[in-house]
Amino acid sequence: MDLAYMAALPQEEFTERRQKVFAQMQPNSALLLFSEIEKRRNNDCDFPFRQDSYFWYLTGFNEPNAALLLIKTEEAEKAVVFLRPRDPLLETWNGRRLGVERAPQKLNVDEAYSIDDFKTEFPKLTEKLTALYHVADRHPWGDKLLAESAVKFYAVFDWQPMLSEMRLIKSPNEIRLM
């Protein structure tokens, strides 16, 4: 089943999930999660896209080449998404993209940036943070972006146990979809 339009789940549910993640994060930390990318089958034909389950669980967003950044400081919590910008030519062939301008409202996040700006924006957003929740080797394209951003953290934690535990318990909306 394609996760694309299981968005029979209200956006508030994804927001609540992110709030539960924030509650488990330590202050002055960030959680970074990358989406899947499109996988080429041959020449100009891709395999059907399937979103990363963890990324979809926190965003409900079904486009490739995106990243979710959750930032928790002593003062505030912020959800930021990096995604592909709109491209009318490519959208003619591959379907509409959400785009940076509409992402904050549609995904209920605080800020949105082009994924092309990750290397410059990620260091600015995380410069005063001391810890990162991240799973290395899950998405090599994302690990490369992270390495190129040249941000160093005092501690790195694995987010997978936290999110896996959360995903065990299904909401009434999820049960209805099963």
Where in this protein do the model-derived segments appear?
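A composition/biophysics-driven feature that prefers long, compositionally simple stretches
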Residues: 1-177
